[in-house]
Amino acid sequence: MKVCIIGASGFVGGELLRILLQHSGVEVVCATSRRFKGEYVYRVHPNLRGFTQLKFVEPSIDAALKADVVFLALPHGESVKWVPKLYESGVAVFDLSADFRLKDPNAYVEWYKWPQPHPYPDLLQKAVYGQPELHRSELVGAKLVAVPGCMATASILMLAPLAKHGLLGETPPVIDAKIGSSGAGAEGSVVDLHSFRTYVVRPYEPVHHRHIAEIEQELSLLAGKRVKVAFTPHAVDMVRGIFATGHVFVEKMPTEADMWKMYRSMYGDSKFIRIVKDRLGISRYPNVKYVLGSNFVDIGFELDQRLNRLVTFSAIDNLVRGAAGQAVQAFNVAMGFPEDEGLRYIPLAPV
């Protein structure tokens, strides 16, 4: 199956290349970049030296149409210019931007500051939210997939079993997320320079972060009612990784056995979700160190009987499970490949 990556010079584009170059069912036929047009891919992504002789080409519809599948690793607001033409042509599209994640066209005005509602509401409804654990049946054969956001992924998956079992009540769950510097992309702002980022722990967009929209959308679907969340992310001194902590206040506390049953019933057959709650060993709860470079989501929980509070944890690699890895996982499900094809990475340790 021939694949083209539009926007292949950034961190996410590089991860797509790393994964797809080792996928047994894929031939990467084009990787685009305006800035690096004509340059060897490995000169921008040195870790790929020896694995490919591809050169970057100018992004164009014509280049994309040489492939069966197109991965769009473009900034928010850019994919919407590409998707209609690609979709009409019959090419399968996996969009890693936010441009087709939200079902409500008006949500793009509120959360992404678009000047008007989404111009393609029909395509919004056709797009499948690309989280295989929650939308597996819809993904099979899908031609337009909206790959979830990184912090949304960590947040949704740790709270999904609680939403499904009616434990998200009137009090909004509180989500505290930490993310590494690669989340800012390959061309971040001045505060992402080493001298500013080293040793940092700082909040950003502490209220009304745009990932709230998809977190609430997905949890509401599972709960069968409107769910709101309080979400605050923090930039921290690491390159890769997201760690999220969720606080859910309930009227009636489940037992620990109930919690295990809820999480196992939803994720027991998942190839990429590991429940980490151990009384022994050096990692008794999820830890970003033990998912780096992989597509795993490590999820844990604890019960606070004093406050009727459920504490949930999740750890992911933001570039893999939070972006490129999840895109390939969704691609595998959509196209009939083994779900873990190209994604069989044991996380590095120590790092």
From Swiss-Prot:
Q: What are the alphabetically sorted keywords of the record?
A: Amino-acid biosynthesis, Arginine biosynthesis, Cytoplasm, Lysine biosynthesis, NADP, Oxidoreductase
Name where it's found: Cytoplasm
InterPro entries, per this entry? Answer: AGPR_type-1, LysY, NAD(P)-bd_dom_sf, NAGSA_dehydrogenase, Semialdehyde_DH_NAD-bd
Pathway(s) per entry: Amino-acid biosynthesis; L-lysine biosynthesis via AAA pathway; L-lysine from L-alpha-aminoadipate (Thermus route): step 3/5; Amino-acid biosynthesis; L-arginine biosynthesis
Catalyzed chemical reaction(s): [amino-group carrier protein]-C-terminal-N-(1-carboxy-5-oxopentan-1-yl)-L-glutamine + phosphate + NADP(+) = [amino-group carrier protein]-C-terminal-N-(1-carboxy-5-phosphooxy-5-oxopentan-1-yl)-L-glutamine + NADPH + H(+); [amino-group carrier protein]-C-terminal-gamma-(L-glutamyl-5-semialdehyde)-L-glutamate + phosphate + NADP(+) = [amino-group carrier protein]-C-terminal-gamma-(5-phospho-L-glutamyl)-L-glutamate + NADPH + H(+)
EC class: oxidoreductase
Q: Name one Pfam family in it.
A: Semialdhyde_dhC_1
Instruction: Indicate whether DNA-binding appears among the record's keywords.
Output: no
Its predominant location is cytoplasm
Binding of NADP(+), residues:
S9, G10, F11, V12, S33, R34, R35, N318
Question: E.C. number, please?
Answer: 1.2.1.103, 1.2.1.106
Q: Name one GO biological process term.
A: lysine biosynthetic process via aminoadipic acid
Oxidoreductase: is it a keyword of this entry? yes
Q: GO: which molecular function terms?
A: N-acetyl-gamma-aminoadipyl-phosphate reductase activity; N-acetyl-gamma-glutamyl-phosphate reductase activity; NAD binding; NADP+ binding
Q: Which residues form the active site?
A: C150
A GO-annotated cellular component: cytoplasm
The entry assigns this protein to a family as follows: Belongs to the NAGSA dehydrogenase family. Type 1 subfamily. LysY sub-subfamily.
- PANTHER family per record: [LYSW]-L-2-AMINOADIPATE_[LYSW]-L-GLUTAMATE PHOSPHATE REDUCTASE-RELATED, N-ACETYL-GAMMA-GLUTAMYL-PHOSPHATE REDUCTASE, CHLOROPLASTIC-RELATED-RELATED
Described purpose of this protein according to its UniProt entry: Involved in both the arginine and lysine biosynthetic pathways.
**What is the protein named?**
Putative [LysW]-L-2-aminoadipate/[LysW]-L-glutamate phosphate reductase
- Where is the organism placed in the taxonomic lineage, from the top? Archaea, Thermoproteota, Thermoprotei, Thermoproteales, Thermoproteaceae
